[in-house]
A protein has these predicted regions:
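Residue-level hotspots at or immediately adjacent to binding/recognition sites across diverse folds
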Residues: 1-128
C-alpha cells in the first residue's frame, strides 16, 4: 500500500473534510481554518471566513449553497463556496459539530447542546 501525507499549508488541527459537487474539496479546522482544493488535495488554498471559531460541521445543501457549523454557535453560509456570511441564531452559543439537510430546505444541527431542527428559511430570517 502507498500512503501519502498531503501538505495543507496549515498547522491548524483539521476536523472535517467535505467533497463538493464537481469534486472540489474543503477542509475545516481550528480557529476558523477553511481550505479549498481543486486538484484532489495536491494543493490547498485558504479561504477567508468572518469568524475565528473552530469549524466542525459542513454540508452542501440541495440548492448548492454551503452551511458550516462551528464553536460558539457560529454558522457560516456561502452561495458560491468562496465567500462566507456569518449567521448566528439568537441565544445559541453551543458548538455545532454536524450540519445536515434532512429534506430540501430542512436542516438538522447537532452539537454540545443537542439537536436542533429548523428550516433554511427560518435560519435566514433569524441570522444576526
Amino acid at each position: 500500500r502507498h500512503w501519502e501525507t498531503l501538505d495543507s499549508g496549515s498547522n491548524a488541527s483539521l476536523y472535517k473534510l467535505l467533497q463538493l459537487n464537481g469534486g472540489r474539496l474543503l477542509v475545516l479546522g481550528f480557529g476558523g481554518t477553511l481550505l479549498s482544493s481543486d486538484d484532489q488535495g495536491a494543493s490547498w488554498q485558504p479561504l477567508s471566513v468572518p469568524a475565528r471559531a473552530g469549524l466542525y460541521g459542513a454540508a452542501q445543501l440541495v440548492d448548492g449553497s454551503l452551511l458550516l457549523g462551528g464553536h460558539g454557535g457560529v454558522l457560516l453560509h456561502s452561495e458560491d463556496g468562496r465567500s462566507f456570511e456569518l449567521w448566528q441564531l439568537p441565544g445559541r452559543k453551543n458548538a455545532w459539530l454536524s450540519v445536515a439537510e434532512a429534506a430540501p430546505g430542512q436542516l438538522v444541527l447537532s452539537g454540545n447542546g443537542g439537536l436542533l431542527a429548523l428550516s433554511l428559511a427560518e435560519l435566514k430570517e433569524q441570522k444576526q
